[in-house]
């Protein structure tokens, strides 16, 4: 952080190498130089003794004017010496910061320090108290809990931009250590603890069993029980602002009859609770989205697998129709029975006459009708064969007669 140097006195003078007679006028040193007539030396003629012209700090050009301005051991043109904010010419004093010049009014408006307690500007003539990078008025440098003004040599803690004296900081540390931020309320209400109040013995036993691994010399931590009205007031204020200012906390403490520190701790725990709930809700949303995405991917894969196979035709019930035929139309000897010998020649049971035409004979077939039996031949064949049942009876009688 640059520290402004100023106000700087302005010097108005002539270039070097000339005789002068000086006088002070309103803080400006005015020097008037007159050239002394006389013969020029050899060094002046050769240029080795000629002084180098001064360079303006504002425009970085050499100054060839009769007069120049001197500020903070740097040279300026008269027209270049002006405020960087309001462009007004600087005549008596100025403020220098970041290689720029400012008048007093603009410098105080732009770069004046502000009190970290009341956020008001600090005048250059005021005494201040510093804590790290924060600057305070003397009256604003006090504890935010007990409002006791801190003096030189007092021990204090700067936490989240707020000043705490040593005593209040130790109380806050003990109170925060006694409260778990994972609970819904660090200070419970009476209606929530209604079921637990009659079991005092069980509560003391459970508390003792929970503290078995801890230091027994440590004193019991204080515990505050809130009523329903107090919780409602805190929640209503929390809905308006999760980080109330000190005045709001003091008002709540006065309305509920609690200390300001208890109110502050409740708001801290409530903020931690809301952050935890938001984090848990976000995790649930991410888990649901991942499950939904997995189901969609699985269903799409199943559809792709099913689409690669052709659908099978539905099974058709084949009904075999059993044709009922008369006994005479079927072979009576299909069941493996040995047919009895027919009377006469068993090789030619139907006689010696040929039923079919002899295809291998010399006579050729003149037409397709020659290959089939004529109607007369069919009738003679049926007369020759007769009824199969009658033939069966005749065969049986001939068998037993022999």
UniProtKB/Swiss-Prot annotation:
This is LIM homeobox transcription factor 1-beta. GO terms for biological process: dopaminergic neuron differentiation; dorsal/ventral pattern formation; neuron differentiation; positive regulation of transcription by RNA polymerase II; regulation of DNA-templated transcription; regulation of transcription by RNA polymerase II. The keyword Nuclease does not apply. It comes from Homo sapiens. Interacts with DHX9. Residues 56-106, 115-168 form the LIM zinc-binding domain. Pfam families: Homeodomain, LIM. It is found in: Nucleus.
């Amino acid at each position: 952080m640059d520290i402004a140097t100023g106000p700087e006195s302005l010097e108005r003078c002539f270039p070097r190498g000339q005789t002068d007679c000086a006088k002070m006028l309103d803080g400006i040193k005015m020097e008037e130089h007159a050239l002394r007539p006389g013969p020029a030396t050899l060094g002046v003629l050769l240029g080795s003794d000629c002084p180098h012209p001064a360079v303006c700090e504002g425009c970085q050009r050499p100054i060839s004017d009769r007069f120049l301005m001197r500020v903070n051991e740097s040279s300026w043109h008269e027209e270049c010496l002006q405020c960087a904010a309001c462009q007004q010419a600087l005549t008596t004093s100025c403020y220098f910061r970041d290689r720029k010049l400012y008048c007093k009014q603009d410098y105080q408006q732009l770069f004046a320090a502000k009190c970290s307690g009341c956020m008001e500007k600090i005048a250059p003539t005021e005494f201040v108290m510093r804590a790290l990078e924060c600057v305070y008025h003397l009256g604003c440098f006090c504890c935010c809990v007990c409002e006791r003004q801190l003096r030189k040599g007092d021990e204090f803690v700067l936490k989240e931009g707020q000043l705490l004296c040593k005593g209040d900081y130790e109380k806050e540390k003990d109170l925060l250590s006694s409260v778990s931020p994972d609970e819904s309320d660090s200070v419970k209400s009476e209606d929530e603890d209604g079921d637990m109040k009659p079991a005092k013995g069980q509560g003391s036993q459970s508390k003792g069993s929970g503290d078995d691994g801890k230091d027994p010399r440590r004193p019991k931590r204080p515990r505050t029980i809130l009523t329903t009205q107090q919780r409602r007031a805190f929640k209503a204020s929390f809905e308006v602002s999760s980080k109330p200012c000190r005045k709001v906390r003091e008002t709540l403490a006065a309305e509920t009859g609690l200390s300001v520190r208890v109110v502050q701790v409740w708001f801290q725990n409530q903020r931690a609770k809301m952050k935890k709930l938001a984090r848990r809700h976000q995790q649930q949303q991410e888990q649901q989205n991942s499950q939904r995405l997995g189901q969609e991917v699985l269903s799409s894969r199943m559809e792709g697998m099913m689409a690669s196979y052709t659908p099978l035709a539905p099974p058709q019930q084949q009904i075999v129709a059993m044709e009922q035929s008369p006994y005479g139309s079927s072979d009576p000897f299909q069941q493996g029975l040995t047919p009895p010998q027919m009377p006469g020649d068993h090789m030619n049971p139907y006689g010696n006459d040929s039923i079919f035409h002899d295809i291998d004979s010399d006579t050729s077939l003149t037409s397709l009708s020659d290959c089939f039996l004529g109607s007369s031949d069919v009738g003679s064949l049926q007369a020759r064969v007769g009824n199969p049942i009658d033939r069966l009876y005749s065969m049986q009688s001939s068998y037993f007669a022999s």
